[in-house]
Amino acid sequence: MIKPLSEQYVSFLHDESRLTGEAADISFPQTVGEVKTVVAQCLALKVPITVQGARTGICGGAVPRRGHLMNLSEMNKPLNVLKGNDGAFYLTVQPGYLLSSLRRDLRTRRFEWLDPALVDPAALAAFSQAPEQFWPPDPSELTASIGGIASTNSRGPGAFKYGSADNFIAALQVVTNDAEEHEIKDDRDLLEAFIGGEGMLGVITALTLRLQSKPSEMWGIGFFFNDENKAAGFMDQAVAAGLPALAALDFLDAVSLTLAGELKQVAAKLREIPETPPEARAAVYIELHGDSEGEIEIAAQELMEAAETFGSDPDTSWALSGDETEKLRLFRHAVPEAVNTRLDQIRLDYPGAVKMGGDLTWPGISFAESLAHYRRDIEKSELTAVIFGHARDNHLHVNLLPRNEAERQRAADLMAAWLDHSRELNGRLFREHGVGKIKSELFLNHEQPREIQSWRELKDRLDPDGLWNPGNMFQEVVE
């Protein structure tokens, strides 16, 4: 069950962050029993365990520092469908179950792998006859595992309307330091500690997801602007409109559009997407969700008129509905993919290059003010940067791409200043990507002291020997 970390497994030593680690051995458990066996063997010998899902993280949280690497990709099935007293449906899944599989199975309602010992036939029958369900967090990275999404409390494009994953996770099964499985359901504080805990407290072996009826109307709209400041003004007006149907409101700067366009030339999945207007300096991506076509049409018309007042040409806008909106999501998701491709190119000349990506919020000020602040700092620093992200709480992902050691230091200083500004505004310093190993120093130097202390106390209580995912959040000290 536990295998030496030989050459055939070296790809498991890194994730999308491009950080590479090391481990002595690896396992691919398929059952809870196998997880418990591996955990018992490792902890008895004080061997650290790094828990890993689909390796789509960008902060190195699933990259091992040493010890044992437990990959959960073989625990990839749905287990049970329930109907709650609230009338909602709940789906219990294994942690390695991919978001793409969840979306497919909810669409087709074919759950061949459900455990017959668990399933209530009446609940399954009701589910098969109910309107199509969906899981609202729905991050844009379809190859992410549900366990991984939970471990960073990730959000999708629809976070403007639905919030984070923890709003739609009702219960967890976890194996902890006693090598036994425990259910966490009623203790919401403990549940939310594991959701977003980055594998530092134990291994998630099952998750119960709260589903919701899929809106019958789902529209995707893209507006293009020749001036990013006008795009920012439109973002603020769209937020102020308070439209109930507004599910996603994202910003992409000129570099984002250029990089996504370059990726479009070589990625088959993007070829059906129209070309962006050559003069565009920014874009705003919108999703509208609702059950009334009339409501969606009114919201779309209001947004289109507002965009036009800020200089967006309606003839260049994109508008798709239903399953076609996935094309726009693919374009939006192409931006971080393209950033990683550009980082790989930089590494040819600067092997130590690491992307410094912001994942913080600046609440209480306008989106336009936030964007202007970032842009002013970037221009002063003369760094290469890509800006994209969400309107809610001005949650922008500012990616800095240093090309040499001097730029790396300037990027680190700039990121530190932005984190401090977020703290001054009572924002979130690490919102949806986690801290992992890449941002642990930033976490310790800039997070609110009470937040650091809370995590430290929890870690000491549930993992006193520091054997679960060492190096995440807290810098590991090896004696």
Which residues does each PLM region occupy?
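Short acidic/histidine-rich active-site segments
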Residues: H390, R428-V435, P470-M473
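N-terminal accessory segments
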Residues: M1-D25, Q41, L45-I49, A54, ...
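N-terminal flexible segment immediately upstream of the FAD-binding catalytic core
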Residues: M1-A40, T56-F89, D105-T108, S256-L263, ...
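C-terminal substrate-recognition/cap domain of FAD-linked oxidoreductases
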Residues: P4-F12, F224, A232-D413, A417, ...
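FAD-binding subdomain of flavoenzyme oxidoreductases
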Residues: P78-V81, T92-D250
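Short beta-strand elements
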Residues: E74, A170-V174, E192-G196, G202-L211, ...
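Activity-critical C-terminal alpha-helical subdomain
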Residues: K439-E479
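Flexible, low-complexity linker/loop segments at domain and module junctions
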Residues: L211-M218, E275-A280, E479
